[in-house]
Amino acid sequence: LTIKVGGSPIKVRIPAGIKDGQKVRVKGHGKPGTHGGPTGDLEVAVTVKPHPVYSREGNDLVMDLPVTVSEAILGAVVDVPMVDGNTATVKVPAGSSSGTEIRVRGGGVTTSKATGDLIARVAIRVPEKPGRELKKLAKEMAQAEGDLDVRATLAEAAQE
């Protein structure tokens, strides 16, 4: 990265894996020293632009992994895009709910000290305008679920 300070271009090396708000020091490019002392260092505050797919938690990258209702119920093998442009094939376990985490080891941010993982969080997606066949299948599924109450303990847990 090249920045201009006082009209002069200065090269700044941004290390891999730098976090938002961290500072990079450029030795000898700060203000002149007093009484003939050495020139000070320039500190550059880094702002990391948010990514449309990935967010960062420590050295881990986190993303939503859209899956269909049938993939969540039955399980599926899907490709996940990696930040380096490659893909990783992962298994969505049968019975996954939204929020289920699938970890790809070594798919996160690499720093001088460690490499994080990519965490793909299952995000069940339903069609905005389901067709007649999907509605019919959903009604059959509702009947098959019988008395299943997925919110049975919600009110009690909310009071704790």
Where are these regions (language model features)?
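Non-catalytic interaction modules of co-chaperones and other macromolecular assembly/maintenance factors
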Residues: L1-E160
